[in-house]
Amino acid sequence: MAKDENKDRIYELVKQRNEYMQQGKTLEEVKVLKELAELTEEVYGEESNENIQILNELGGTLKYTGEFETAVNTIIKAKNIIEKKYGRDIVPYATCNLNLAEVYRFMKKFDKIEELYLETMEIYQKNNLQNDYLYASVCNNLGLFYQDTGRFQDALTLHEKSLEILEKLPEYKLQYATTLSNMVLPYLKTGEKEKSEEVLDKSLRLIENTVGKEHSLYSASLNNMAVQYYNEGEFKKALKYFEASAKICRRSFGENSGNYKSLLQNIEIVKERLGKNE
């Protein structure tokens, strides 16, 4: 009887989690995922496919709230179960790699990240997923890694590949908008200011029309707009958009989030520049 009750609770939590995802409420989503992980292991077993999936999803989401150690341990646990049961050439193993690489990217532990991304791409290719959303995701995320390490032209090549795939998958319009937003900085850095403005404007409109102005993805686009204004020397406008982005980011991810801390640093930098210009 208790097992049936737990299954009912799992169903309720999955529904609740999906609502929080749609609303961009990551702090609330993490709480739900943690309870889901406990119940899923209890109901289906530690080595079940259900448990593998929830561990992977929990680990991938924890990076946004700054719970890096737990994120790494959770994903590695899922990877080990998959490897033991199925080997390394299946899609869930690749997705674990992708999530682990993203956690390391948020932690700025860059030494093994590229290897993880490339292994992920290879596994997706072996499984004929070159035109799938999953392949678009790894292209986009590897592009972000190249941005973090100053390889902006390489980043653009990968973001463009991601867009090419997502254009044919209309159900992923939010992910399409996110990829556009991710292209703002590399276009700026490679001297293509008009393209940078074009993708920023398009991404903002798509995100606003899809999930509204309170979503974490809208926060990311506001951050990109602030970066544009900062690079143009319009520090008051940059401050306005950094602060608006930080407000949404804090609600979505909490004060321990790396994104939120980065925004606070940017706000201080802009205030310092404004002080010098007065």
PLM features: what roles do these ranges have?
Residues 11-22, 49-64, 91-106, 133-148, ...:
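Conserved alpha-helical positions within TPR/SEL1-like repeat arrays
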